[in-house]
Amino acid sequence: MKKQNDIPQPIRGDKGATVKIPRNIERDRQNPDMLVPPETDHGTVSNMKFSFSDTHNRLEKGGYAREVTVRELPISENLASVNMRLKPGAIRELHWHKEAEWAYMIYGSARVTIVDEKGRSFIDDVGEGDLWYFPSGLPHSIQALEEGAEFLLVFDDGSFSENSTFQLTDWLAHTPKEVIAANFGVTKEEISNLPGKEKYIFENQLPGSLKDDIVEGPNGEVPYPFTYRLLEQEPIESEGGKVYIADSTNFKVSKTIASALVTVEPGAMRELHWHPNTHEWQYYISGKARMTVFASDGHARTFNYQAGDVGYVPFAMGHYVENIGDEPLVFLEIFKDDHYADVSLNQWLAMLPETFVQAHLDLGKDFTDVLSKEKHPVVKKKCSK
């Protein structure tokens, strides 16, 4: 990519030309490999990127919520997401929805509640790096603690909308008062102050201690916690970074969503691989990345990502994620499945006869000798001589 007066231009060697019309130069700077794609890109490949910065933001007195769904990123038919921020003490009101909800706490801390169909209550505090999972149809809430909270929500249906959930206050606002009174065994006068519309996100005082909020019931405790301390587990570490994996094998309740938190150091990359079970949905937390997706039949397309971007890789398509910045790249891989699975290109070739691989790639023993039978999700790039 050539630059004129620090302005990027779509020129590679003797191909391309300078841009003469008005344009968004900052967007071009953020997407160098889209402005000037690698020579290896070819054919028509669907868009696999959308930024939360380009979404509508729902502002409330206690915080905000914005979403990336199939409406914003059409290829993402199986997963949708919400970025939510709550001020200290603010509450995402009691509600439920048809879709299961998976969450990663990015900033601050919050208290979550959920009650299952047997009337068993679960209440816990979650902090940065923690997860929660609420099965479809079960009522729950989120309240920010002292520092406030910001988190990513992922739902197992791409057409989910944060504006179409079942709210406690919305339901009661659209139910006759005499019915509500009869249901709870009170008079209409005793419920005269019920809100006339949904609260959704609203300000409130900070809660007391977690111990004081625990509610014991006659039906005992839930069999498995609905929260998970992801960063307390041992990651898969390599020279180039580390990976934390959470799925139904270690986070028992997470039956429809599996995940990986990936850190890629500068000069390293998430290795060439693919996923044999489902599509991959991504959220970029920090750093700068590029990813090329191989769609078969000679088709491939490269994308750039940074904090706040959503990425996507369709089922079984080969790809890598490279750190192109000077700080650690941190991102989430999310899958609509009960378990995490990937196939490493390096390991695949290492587990085949050497001469068989050499015949395919027209490479010699020097190449096959360095193949690894062990999987290394993140690899450090070797400098060329």
UniProtKB/Swiss-Prot annotation:
It holds the Pfam family Cupin_1. It is found in: Cytoplasm. One of its GO terms (cellular component) is cytoplasm. Its EC number is 4.1.1.2. Its cofactor is Mn(2+). Residues 24-47 are annotated as: Disordered. It catalyses: oxalate + H(+) = formate + CO2. InterPro entries: Bicupin_oxalate_deCO2ase/Oxase, Cupin_1, GPI/OXD, RmlC-like_jellyroll, RmlC_Cupin_sf. Keywords: Cytoplasm, Decarboxylase, Lyase, Manganese, Metal-binding. Mn(2+) 2 binds at residues 273, 275, 280, 319. GO terms for molecular function: metal ion binding; oxalate decarboxylase activity. It is an enzyme of class 4 (lyase). Induction: Induced by acid pH but not by oxalate. Positively regulated by SigO and its coactivator RsoA. Mn(2+) 1 binds at residues 95, 97, 101, 140. The active site is at 333 (proton donor). To B.subtilis OxdD. Homohexamer. NCBIfam families: bicupin_oxalic. Converts oxalate to formate and CO(2) in an O(2)-dependent reaction. Can also catalyze minor side reactions: oxalate oxidation to produce H(2)O(2), and oxalate-dependent, H(2)O(2)-independent dye oxidations. This is Oxalate decarboxylase OxdC. It comes from Bacillus subtilis (strain 168). The lineage of its organism: Bacteria, Bacillati, Bacillota, Bacilli, Bacillales.
